[in-house]
Amino acid sequence: MELYSLTIHELRELLKKREVSALEVTKSYLERIKEVEPKIDALITITEDFALQRAKEADEKIKNGEDTALTGIPVIIKDNISTEGIKTTCSSKMLENYIPPYNATVVEKLLEEGVIILGKSNLDEFAMGSSTENSAFKTTKNPWDLSRVPGGSSGGSAAAIAADEAAFALGSDTGGSIRQPASLCGVVGMKPTYGLVSRYGLVAFASSLDQIGPFTKDVTDCAIVLNTIIGHDPKDSTSLKIDKPDYTSYLKEDIKGLRIGVAKEFFGEGIEEGVKETVQESIKVLQDLGAEIIDISIPYVEYALPAYYIIASAEASSNLARYDGIRYGHIAGKYEDLIDMYMVTRSEGFGKEVKRRIMLGTYALSSGYYDAYYKKALKVRTLIKNDFEKAFEKCDVIIGPTSPTVAFKIGERANDPLAMYLADIYTVSVNIAGLPGISIPCGLSDGLPVGLQIIGRHFDEGKILNVAYAFEQANKFNAKPQAIGGAR
C-alpha cells in the first residue's frame, strides 16, 4: 500500500508511531503528482520546495510531541483561497500573476496545525462553472475517465483527491461547487453551514452564498478537517460564534429511528435512470440500518436554480467591480483614457462565462429590472428557506442525489449554458438556505461515480456526518478510478 493512497487518520496513526516521517509522506505525494498530473491537469501551482520545508518542520513538531490531528498531512488548496507568497489566480487572466500578501483564515489555521501545502488547484474562472472548463489555463480531466469533466467549480480539488495527489483538499461552494465535483469524482465533499467557516481570504464570488469546505477520501477525514477549519473569525462579518464541537464524536452514533426525508423534487425530470436507481438503493441501505424513511416535499425548490443565478450573478457583478486594472491584477497594455483602460482591462482579463454573469447580474440590479428580477429572487430565497424549515419538522436529515447525471464529456455542454447550469439543480437550494450538505460516493452508473447528498439543519454537521459514516460503513464503496493507471 502506497503512502499516498492512505486516509488522514491512517497517515496520522503511522506518523504518531513514528513508523513514517512527514517528509516520506510528502515525497510520496510529490512523486504521485509527477506521475498523474500530466494526465489530469488538476493543479495550477505545485509548491514542492515549500512542501518539503514544511514536512521537515512537521517532523520536528512530532518529535517534540507538539503534533495535532493534522500535523504532517499534505493538502491542496483551491486557487481562489489566498496563500501568502503563493500565486492565487482564480484561474483567471485577471489574476494570472497575483501573489497575495496574506493567508486566508482557513490556510492560517491549517498551517498552525502543521499541514503541508502541496499546491493550488484548478477551478472554473472565479469559481463560476460546473465543469472546470472555464479555467483560463487548462481543463481538468476526471480521473475515472479522462474524456470527461471532474465537475466544478472546484474540479481541480476533487480530481486531485480522486487521483491521490493529496490527503485532502479545500474547495469553495457557492451553488454546489464542492458537492457536485465530489459526486462526479467519487470522493467526499462537504459544504458547511453558512458562517461556520471564515470566508476571510476567499476571493468573493457571491458573498451571501460562498462557503469553504473540505474534500476527503472518507467521512472520518471530513470530520477531522472540519474540526480544524471551523470557528469564529472577527475578520469575517458573517462568521458565527458557536461552541466548537468534536465532529469525530458523532460518527459512530446509532442511526436507528433517525428520520430521513426523501423529497420528490430531487427525483424529477432530467435525472439519469442509473443515478436514480443507485440513490434509491442507497436509501434502502439506510432503511436497513434502522432509519425511518419519510416522503417529504420542498415545493419552491424548483425555483431555486433561476433564483440562484440572479442572486449569485448580481453579487458577482458587484464583487468583480474591484478588478479595474489600477490596484492589482491585469492591466490593459493599450488604452486611450481612464474609461477605456477599465473597459480594455476587463475585456482582456475576464473570460466568457464571467462576462456573461457580470452582464446578467448588472441587468438584474438595474433600476428598471430590480423589482422584476433581483427583488423577486430574494423573495423566492425566503420561500425556499421556509420550505426547508417545514421539511425539518418532519425529518432529521434530507437525502437525494447530488447531481442529476454522472460526469459528462468535456465540451459536451460548452455551448449550452442552460444545460451546464442544470448540473447544480440539486445543490443550489442548500446554499440559498445557508444549510450544511455533504456528498458521499454511493455507487457507480456506467462505471462512473454517483454521489448521495445528505442535507441537515443549520449547524447540524454532526448529524450529517453520523448518517454519512453509517452509510459509508454499510455500503463499503471501494471502487477506484482506473483511467490514470489504477489510482489507489
From Swiss-Prot:
Residue numbers annotated as active site: 78 (charge relay system), 153 (charge relay system), 177 (acyl-ester intermediate)
Transmembrane segments: none
A Pfam short name: Amidase
The entry's keywords: ATP-binding, Ligase, Nucleotide-binding, Protein biosynthesis
EC number: 6.3.5.7
Single GO term (MF): ATP binding
Class of enzymatic activity (EC top level): ligase
Gene3D superfamilies given in the database record: Amidase signature (AS) domain
Record's GO cellular component terms: glutamyl-tRNA(Gln) amidotransferase complex
Biological process terms in GO annotation: translation
Intrachain disulfide bonds: none
Matching InterPro entries: Amidase, Amidase_CS, Amidase_dom, AS_sf, GatA
Catalytic activity, as annotated: L-glutamyl-tRNA(Gln) + L-glutamine + ATP + H2O = L-glutaminyl-tRNA(Gln) + L-glutamate + ADP + phosphate + H(+)
Summary of the function given for this chain in its UniProt record: Allows the formation of correctly charged Gln-tRNA(Gln) through the transamidation of misacylated Glu-tRNA(Gln) in organisms which lack glutaminyl-tRNA synthetase. The reaction takes place in the presence of glutamine and ATP through an activated gamma-phospho-Glu-tRNA(Gln).
NCBIfam families xrefs: gatA
Description of how the protein assembles with itself and partners: Heterotrimer of A, B and C subunits.
Family, per entry: Belongs to the amidase family. GatA subfamily.
Protein name listed in UniProt: Glutamyl-tRNA(Gln) amidotransferase subunit A
Source organism of this protein record: Thermoanaerobacter pseudethanolicus (strain ATCC 33223 / 39E)
